[in-house]
Amino acid sequence: MEQLVESLRALQVGEVRVNESLAHHTTWKIGGPADVFVIPNDIEGLKNTMKLIQETGCKWRVIGRGSNILVSDKGLRGVTIKLDKGLDHLEVNGESITVGAGFPVVKLATVISRQGLAGLEFAAGIPGSVGGAVFMNAGAHGSDISQILTKAHVLFPDGTLRWLTNEEMAFSYRTSLLQKNDGICVEAIFSLTRGDKEDIKKKLQKNKDYRRDTQPWNHPTCGSVFRNPLPEYAGQLIEKAGLKGYQIGGAQISTMHANFIVNTGDAKAADVLALIHHVKDTIQKQYQMNMETEVELIGER
């Protein structure tokens, strides 16, 4: 691993850190150390990082802003790559925008609204990055990424870069092709529509206000923990089961919205995991329903 670190630094791929606490890089503020942590300077830096990883055969993982993931207390082995400011470019071409994977979704929705472009209002309050949003087909308020994505620029582990169409991305509810294949979305093209700036601004603010009033943004959280077992809603089921406010260690089911687990200050991944299992067991016993997690559980157990 030391040789890999030296090689990464010699190639000047970006920031390279050793034993970096992932609690600093997740919205839950939870997670053990990454053996090697890389923040690429650009797409070329990411390509060179992946080339070295393939040559050494070590494990790897890509993260964005760290939402929608639960990193174990033991952390991640191998190389963790964070797509951040090196991949946060934005180009507007009429009603089409090309945006880097590291661009924050909330910021994008705000910036685009000021230019009179509609279609991203649903993303107000989504805590992740563009890359993560594409990866999981993030959505809210009746829309999702699949409704606006034209193409995704994907880097595969063998170093090839390909533009994948919306159809090739195989989107479904909170799912995309990238969850089944080892591709990394490095940028995306979204197709938006021209609209009235004031109308777009009002809709965006309405969605932001809804999230602020109904979801617990005063504590670290990852976003929604469970997928909605349609036509039911996960939060409503958990609340009906009497689990609002239930706490294990430093992890608590939010008293505002039961599909959120908050870090009250000193939560460990083990606390959150125990709480997730308790919810699943309770819902299974009371309603004979299997609750699937929307949050991804990663790292050494």
Curated annotation (Swiss-Prot):
Main location (coarse class): cytoplasm
Keyword check for Kinase: no
GO molecular function: FAD binding; UDP-N-acetylmuramate dehydrogenase activity
Gene Ontology BP terms: cell division; cell wall organization; peptidoglycan biosynthetic process; regulation of cell shape
InterPro entries named in the record: FAD-bd_PCMH, FAD-bd_PCMH-like_sf, FAD-bd_PCMH_sub1, FAD-bd_PCMH_sub2, MurB, MurB_C, MurB_C_sf, Oxid_FAD_bind_N
Family of this protein: Belongs to the MurB family.
Function summary: Cell wall formation.
Protein name: UDP-N-acetylenolpyruvoylglucosamine reductase
Originating organism: Halalkalibacterium halodurans (strain ATCC BAA-125 / DSM 18197 / FERM 7344 / JCM 9153 / C-125) (Bacillus halodurans)
Designated gene of the protein: murB
